[in-house]
């Protein structure tokens, strides 16, 4: 959850509350100041009666200190995150295809995620020493040097929005439909703290022009800003899009935002999108990527509330194909899938595969499709029982070929095309 948790495939969720020690009265067995059953032998036989009477209070004070220390530890956040098994649920419940929603689904394709949680001191000890089904990362390794927790969550939702578009494009293209897209701007993906952008822009907004000159892509933005020196005041046309309360990307109106360019911390040479390298001396302080507007011949809507990250791409692609294919893709099997996808149907590696394997087993999957590369296949095999058959794939075509061998059926152009609205 992209796909880095609120579930993530992504997004962070509150750390689980660790079990608390019992109150002092329970630990002693009695609360009347006398010796608890089974503790009398702990009192030295030669001790005075005063010593014997005070012993429960000494233990009570010790337990109180332990409880207090546990409470403090449970409320101190530390710069570590944990990835734990999340859920695995039928992907068809997230997908709407009005032209095909009357088809009965045979079997299930499961979308799986993980939970990404920031740790407190007590939870860190629990996951480090008492639970082997997790991965712990430092905030530096997971977020990077300058990404805040809230920005990390927003980036996960942006990855999911892109994954939905790519999954739809890959699915429809495989089924024989014609799919096109248009570059419409430079999406603000990250913001450098203390930069000019930090005062003016927000993650998920889209820059469409600089001083009135259109910037329809990341490359266009780089080229436009390259013309100006540090200290120059420019006006950015910014679509004020955002992430809503359920993690969905929402477009907004365009506003004009004045920004004074700063001197780049270090002059950097940029390979200008296939053109000659250019040296940047001024910067606005953002990480950007090209925002695309997709034209689909079939109306497909994907609702993945509060799930972030890119790794649901393969599952969503298969789910869309299954919807349009009459629900016959799995051959009646319960099939789980994870993997990042591009618009061409290529599948690349994701995180949390070991934890996802645990989640899909718990959900009853018998087949698990994972990316073949970067250790994903090995991670899944290391956690899978003999009842879960793991297959590594690099493309949607390979995934479909495996499902066909297992009894699934795929056709092309299964429903008449109708422009999405």
What do the PLM-derived regions correspond to, one by one?
Residues 1-55, 136-137, 146:
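Terminal targeting segments of Actinobacterial cell-envelope proteins
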Residues 82-105, 109-116, 139-192, 265-337:
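PDZ/PDZ-like peptide-tail recognition elements
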Residues 197-220, 239, 357, 361-370:
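Conserved PDZ fold ligand-binding element
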Residues 223-280, 382-405, 412-420:
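PDZ-domain C-terminal substructure recognizer with occasional recognition of PDZ-binding tails
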């Amino acid at each position: 959850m992209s796909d880095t948790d609120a579930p993530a495939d992504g997004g962070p969720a509150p750390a689980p509350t660790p079990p608390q020690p019992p109150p002092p009265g329970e630990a002693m067995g009695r609360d009347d100041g006398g010796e608890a059953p089974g503790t009398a032998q702990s009192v030295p036989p030669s001790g005075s009666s005063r010593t014997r009477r005070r012993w429960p209070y000494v233990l009570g004070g010790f337990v109180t200190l332990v409880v207090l220390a546990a409470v403090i530890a449970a409320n101190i956040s530390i710069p570590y995150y944990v990835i734990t098994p999340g859920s695995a649920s039928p992907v068809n419940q997230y997908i709407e295809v009005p032209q095909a929603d009357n088809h009965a689904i045979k079997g299930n394709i499961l979308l799986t995620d993980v939970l990404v949680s920031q740790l407190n001191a007590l939870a860190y000890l629990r996951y480090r020493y008492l639970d082997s089904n997790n991965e712990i990362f430092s905030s530096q390794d997971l977020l990077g040097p300058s990404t805040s927790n809230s920005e990390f969550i927003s980036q996960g939702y942006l990855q999911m929005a892109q994954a939905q578009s790519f999954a739809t494009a890959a699915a429809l293209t495989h089924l024989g439909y014609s799919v096109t897209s248009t570059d419409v701007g430079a999406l603000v993906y990250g913001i450098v703290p203390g930069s000019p952008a930090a005062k003016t822009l927000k993650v998920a907004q889209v820059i469409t022009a600089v001083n009135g000159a259109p910037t329809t892509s990341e490359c266009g933005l780089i080229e436009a800003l390259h013309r100006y020196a540090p200290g120059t005041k420019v006006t950015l046309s910014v679509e004020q899009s955002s992430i809503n309360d359920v993690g969905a990307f929402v477009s907004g109106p365009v506003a004009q935002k004045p920004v004074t360019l700063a001197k780049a911390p270090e002059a950097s040479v940029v390979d200008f999108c296939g053109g000659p390298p250019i040296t940047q001396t001024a910067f606005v302080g953002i990480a950007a990527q090209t925002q695309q507007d997709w034209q689909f011949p079939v109306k497909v809507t994907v609702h993945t509330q509060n799930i972030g990250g890119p790794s649901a791409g393969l599952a969503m692609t298969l789910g869309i194909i299954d919807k349009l294919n009459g629900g016959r893709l799995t051959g009646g099997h319960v099939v789980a899938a994870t993997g990042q996808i591009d618009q061409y149907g290529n599948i690349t590696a994701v995180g949390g595969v070991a934890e996802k394997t645990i989640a899909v087993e718990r959900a009853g999957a018998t087949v698990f499709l994972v990316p073949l590369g970067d250790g994903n296949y090995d991670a899944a095999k290391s956690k899978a029982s003999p009842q879960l058959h793991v297959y590594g794939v690099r493309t949607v075509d390979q995934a479909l070929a495996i499902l066909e061998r297992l009894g699934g059926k795929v056709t092309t152009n299964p429903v008449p095309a109708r422009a999405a609205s």
